[in-house]
């Protein structure tokens, strides 16, 4: 059963506008094997590209894929919701990001282990990629390109290795080289990829140098460095370094300096990169130029600074937003979302220190969600807001951001409260930010695990993982809901009326008796009752529904 959703009421419309299409896609024999928050994209024509994991035979339109272990799929729906094709990576692989270009080509990147067969839409193996030797974890990187029909075009593996000189030192430590793709963006004839890595990475004659830390003179470990790379979009060749942030020295003896997150946005050839980093002696490299970055760092307290760079050809503008050093051992400082719109940059994520964009803003519980708006030309702050939501146990709960939608007057933020001990979702989160004020308010509390948009097209995803033993006995299903006009998606600020609708995952309950009607996302009536205070949906299929009570409406996910 899907996680119970929080109470929410609406009176914005008599009935929220129906989506263009919805679909449920079952891909795993056990729900626990689903890749949560699976990457998605929407192309310029409104076609939806979805990804995820599959452990059972996958039939999608004319495509048929057979899994090897927990495999990864990439599938395409057209604007009307018709299934077009599915391709895949048969083997231990996970797609972490996906993008499209102006011609409808599809690019996916992620992590894998051992040997993985790359399948096209016909199910034929077009290439086999091999990961780092003797590594069972998914620590090797890949990029794959398909055309708009699902035909294989090109692929690339990205492998890290421990530095030979460091590994030969007379010290004790376990080195764990890795490369993890984070975000893909196509701009013109270039494909851009942000990533984190440990160890040395060699690509097309370009080398990313691994960084290491030594403590007590004998114990050493990898440090995390993050970067943005570019490739020729046509064939994934000619790798080039756009930006890197990591420790200045290859081997530091005082402390561990890590880059903790990276995100980026592109507009008209100008690249905006944002990092989270901690360490006294860090170096930002952009357009071949080095800038020293220093954050407050002591043995018992660390600052997690937000470092931004605007790269326009060989011109680089930088800005560092500092916080206050804290002794938080559980660091939750992220840039989960980043977007450019009309001369402004919007960043969203979580933080558990004084907010670097405004040190007067603190957090509650384990962390808070934030949205910051910057002037793209100067990288100066326009405004910043935070959720001020106390999710409870500071050591075991966190606010996770899964999507951000930006328009001229409003920013919508969605996500969930997660138990960090077992990664279970405890409650959905939704926030609306009025960009004119600016002010943040709670929005519709509907579980959305992934979001993709392109212009007025918007695609939302959820799944049926609930973190209980049911995940071992229930098939894993992704649910999608697509709007061809995002302004009528219903993912907007909602207000309380004179009744309250509750949903516990099985039953709809009201504060007072009224007529209840339940619709599918496409508008068909599923169930109705008159003058009642509750209505059971225990026998309804998993999916997205709309509950209407008078002038109120509530989207639920079962």
Segments predicted by a language model, with ranges:
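Sec-dependent, cleavable N-terminal signal peptides
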Residues: 1-13
């Amino acid at each position: 059963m899907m996680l119970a959703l929080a109470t929410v009421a609406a009176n914005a419309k008599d009935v929220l506008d129906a989506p263009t299409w919805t679909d449920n896609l079952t891909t795993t024999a056990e729900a626990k094997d689903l890749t949560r928050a699976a990457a998605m994209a929407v192309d310029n024509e409104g076609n939806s590209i979805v990804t995820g994991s599959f452990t059972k035979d996958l039939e999608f339109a004319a495509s048929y894929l057979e899994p090897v272990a927990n495999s990864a799929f990439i599938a395409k729906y057209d604007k009307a919701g018709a299934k077009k094709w599915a391709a895949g990576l048969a083997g231990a692989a996970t797609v972490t990001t996906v993008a499209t270009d102006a011609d409808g080509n599809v690019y996916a990147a992620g992590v894998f282990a051992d040997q993985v067969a790359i399948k096209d839409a016909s199910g034929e193996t077009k290439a086999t990629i091999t990961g780092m030797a003797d590594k069972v974890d998914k620590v090797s990187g890949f990029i794959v390109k398909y055309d708009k029909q699902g035909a294989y075009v090109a692929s690339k593996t990205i492998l890290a290795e421990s530095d030979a000189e460091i590994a030969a030192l007379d010290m004790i430590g376990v080195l764990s080289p890795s490369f993890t793709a984070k975000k893909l963006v196509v701009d013109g004839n270039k494909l851009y990829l942000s990533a984190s890595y440990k160890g040395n990475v060699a690509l097309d004659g370009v080398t990313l140098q691994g960084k290491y830390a030594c403590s007590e003179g004998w114990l050493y470990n990898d440090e995390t460095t993050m970067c943005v790379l570019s490739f020729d979009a046509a064939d994934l060749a000619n790798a080039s370094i756009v930006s890197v942030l990591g420790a200045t020295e290859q081997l530091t003896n005082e402390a561990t300096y890590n880059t903790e997150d990276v995100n980026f946005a592109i507009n008209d050839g100008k690249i905006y990169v944002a990092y989270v980093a901690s360490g006294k002696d860090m170096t930002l490299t952009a357009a071949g130029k080095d800038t020293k970055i220093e954050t407050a760092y002591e043995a018992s307290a660390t600052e997690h600074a937000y470092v931004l760079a605007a790269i326009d050809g060989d011109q680089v503008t930088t800005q560092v937003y500092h916080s206050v050093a804290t002794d938080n051992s559980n660091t939750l400082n992220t840039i989960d979302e980043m977007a450019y719109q009309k001369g402004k940059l919007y960043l969203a994520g979580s933080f558990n220190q004084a907010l670097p964009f405004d040190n007067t803003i603190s957090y509650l519980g384990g962390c808070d969600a934030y949205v910051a708006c910057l002037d793209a030309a100067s990288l100066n702050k326009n405004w910043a807001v935070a959720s001020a939501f106390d999710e409870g146990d500071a050591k075991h709960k966190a606010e996770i951001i899964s999507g951000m939608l930006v328009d001229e007057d409003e920013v919508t933020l969605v996500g969930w409260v997660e138990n960090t001990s077992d990664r279970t979702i405890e409650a959905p989160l939704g926030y609306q930010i009025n960009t004119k004020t600016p002010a943040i308010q709670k929005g519709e509390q509907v579980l959305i695990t992934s979001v993709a948009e392109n212009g007025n097209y918007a695609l939302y995803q959820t799944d049926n993982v609930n973190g209980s033993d049911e995940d071992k006995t229930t098939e894993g299903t992704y649910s999608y809901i697509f709007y061809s006009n995002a302004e009528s998606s219903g993912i907007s600020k909602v207000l309380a009326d004179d009744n309250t609708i509750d949903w516990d995952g099985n039953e709809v309950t009201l504060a007072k008796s009224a007529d209840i009607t339940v619709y599918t996302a496409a508008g068909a009536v599923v169930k109705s009752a008159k003058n009642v205070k509750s209505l059971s949906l225990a026998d309804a299929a998993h999916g997205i529904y709309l509950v209407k009570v008078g002038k109120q409406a509530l989207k639920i996910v079962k």
